[in-house]
């Protein structure tokens, strides 16, 4: 199989690596991961806007998405909140001291398009009015924020190896905020459309507009969150979703949505720097040979203007060599073990919140396909013709994917929206080198120079990663020892990260360490 990265975004490049994996990798239980889907879905070139032109981005985002009919507004959602209350999830642990809600919000009544959400209110109950509302989005495109975000990363529970029992996550983000997880677009997870043609015309623009419509309708159901400080966070291809939704909020100028900041992790931001940074990471982490790295450097055109250059045989050959070198490791955390079996284990293995189980995807898939779980979540009410899956097999085409979101990030900063870009430093999928190169394209002056931050200040302290702050309220943060899904691998450090992001504070230094 021949794949090249010069004409496609980083996501497509790594899809080539995944599909080109050798027989040894195929014999393992391979996780379907965020970012593996764009090559399969993609049906059109990247959006044409160069990053220097915000006007081009404005033109794209205000154009009707992918020829899809204009959405028809749904009925006002007031009064539905109590019907969405989750009394208890099957297999839940003791001591649940926060409210949960889940259900559907219609975003297009004519198409019958509805998005599924799960809300874990802040610990302590009653949706603590002192804590903000935080929306979490996973990427893909086409991967579930319920399955990944809520059940494997930052949610209040994780699933044990029997696929039936939940255990508590002491570092869940609802210690810091009321956390809303959205499965988007329609066709992902439990979300659906009664117009099946919608599954073939998904894309960046339509996803942002549907997510905005979801928020607008959801706030009618939960009016206590109107005007509450609101933050959007996410990872991977949510590097597109998050700023694009924030941009839609600015354009619609809703008085009910008090957007304060966005935070994106191991995020797809800018095609050519994402791709260059990925191959730089492979070489600097001894994953590919000098010869392969030279072949990539000499024959693959990683520049802002080279991203659309036609494929060439020498670049293809070097890309194939990369795929062979990476076939037997987990590119999403290059130091993590692979899952060796997708079978459930009963009685369950004693879980460890600090040692992420690489087979967790299979436990979550089993749990979310249980009828009693779906009933508790008010999910699958239309009896979908497919099982719940972490990443959608229902979406058939992705019709627009921006080459860059840097101009949108610039626009958000001009509107005093806080922006944090964070990166787990063991991810090879959208690595820290990509994030650094992409942020550097903004050419921002440094406000506070690169330094370590500390996830613990006891004794000699514990370095959680590194941070550099730029003028205009943008911070670039690394998380030490974390892969693509940062809260999965470093949950404590991820909680410190989000707490300080929400507070608008710099991450802790260690000036007081020896006094503790």
From Swiss-Prot:
Glycan-linked positions: 194, 205, 301, 380
Posttranslational modification: The linker peptide is endoproteolytically excised during enzyme maturation.
Disulfide bonds: 143-391, 300-315, 339-359
Pro-piece positions: 21-77, 342-352
EC number(s) recorded for this UniProt protein: 3.4.16.6
Pfam (any one): Peptidase_S10
Organism: Hordeum vulgare (Barley)
MF terms in GO: serine-type carboxypeptidase activity
InterPro entries registered for this protein in UniProt: AB_hydrolase_fold, Peptidase_S10, Ser_caboxypep_his_AS, Ser_caboxypep_ser_AS
Similarity section: Belongs to the peptidase S10 family.
Gene that this sequence comes from: CXP;2-3
Keyword Signal among UniProt keywords: yes
Protein name: Serine carboxypeptidase II-3
Record's subunit section: Carboxypeptidase II is a dimer, where each monomer is composed of two chains linked by a disulfide bond.
UniProt signal peptide: 1-20
């Amino acid at each position: 199989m021949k794949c090249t990265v010069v004409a496609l975004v980083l996501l497509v490049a790594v899809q080539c690596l995944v599909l080109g994996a050798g027989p040894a990798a195929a014999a393992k239980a391979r996780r379907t991961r965020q970012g593996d889907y764009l090559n399969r879905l993609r049906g059109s070139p990247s959006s044409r806007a160069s990053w220097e032109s915000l006007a081009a981005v404005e033109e794209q985002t205000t154009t009707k998405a992918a020829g899809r009919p204009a959405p028809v507004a749904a009925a006002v959602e007031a009064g539905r909140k109590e019907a969405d209350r989750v009394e208890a999830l099957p297999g839940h642990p003791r001591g649940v001291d926060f409210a949960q809600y889940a259900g559907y919000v219609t975003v297009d009544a004519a198409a019958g398009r509805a998005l599924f959400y799960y809300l874990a209110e802040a610990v302590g109950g009653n949706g603590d009015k002192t804590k903000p509302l935080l929306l979490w989005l996973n990427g893909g495109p086409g991967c579930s924020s319920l399955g990944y975000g809520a059940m494997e990363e930052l949610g209040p529970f994780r699933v044990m190896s029997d696929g039936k029992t939940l255990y508590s996550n002491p570092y869940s983000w609802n210690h810091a905020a009321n956390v809303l997880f959205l499965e988007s677009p329609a066709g992902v997870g439990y979300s659906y459309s009664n117009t099946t043609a919608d599954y073939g015309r998904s894309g960046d623009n339509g996803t942002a507009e549907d997510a905005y419509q979801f928020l607008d309708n959801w706030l009618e159901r939960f009016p206590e969150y109107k005007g509450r400080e609101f933050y959007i966070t996410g990872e991977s291809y949510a590097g597109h979703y998050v700023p694009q939704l924030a941009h839609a909020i600015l354009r619609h100028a809703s008085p009910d949505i008090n957007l304060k900041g966005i935070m994106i992790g191991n995020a797809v931001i800018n095609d050519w720097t994402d791709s260059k940074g990925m191959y730089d990471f492979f070489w600097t982490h001894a994953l590919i040979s000098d010869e392969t790295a030279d072949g990539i450097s000499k024959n693959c055109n990683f520049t802002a203007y080279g991203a659309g250059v036609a494929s060439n045989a020498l670049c293809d050959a070097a890309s194939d060599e990369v795929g062979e070198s990476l076939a037997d490791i987990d590119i999403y955390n290059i130091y993590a073990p692979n899952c060796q079996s997708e079978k459930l284990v009963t009685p369950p293995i004693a879980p460890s919140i600090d040692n992420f189980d690489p087979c967790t995807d299979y436990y979550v898939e089993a749990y979310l396909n249980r009828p009693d779980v779906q009933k508790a979540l008010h999910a699958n009410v239309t009896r979908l013709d497919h099982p719940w899956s972490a990443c959608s097999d229902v979406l058939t085409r992705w019709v627009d994917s921006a080459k860059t979101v840097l101009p949108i990030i610039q626009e958000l900063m001009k509107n005093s929206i806080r922006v944090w870009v964070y990166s787990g430093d063991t991810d090879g999928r959208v690595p820290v080198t990509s994030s650094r190169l992409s942020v550097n394209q903004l050419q921002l002056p440094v406000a506070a120079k690169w330094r370590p931050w500390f996830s613990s200040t006891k004794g000699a302290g514990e370095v959680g990663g590194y941070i550099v702050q730029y003028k205009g309220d943008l911070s670039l943060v690394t998380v030490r020892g974390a892969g693509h899904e940062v809260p999965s691998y470093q949950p404590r450090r991820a909680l410190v990260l989000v707490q300080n992001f929400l507070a608008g504070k710099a991450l802790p230094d260690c000036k007081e360490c020896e006094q503790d």
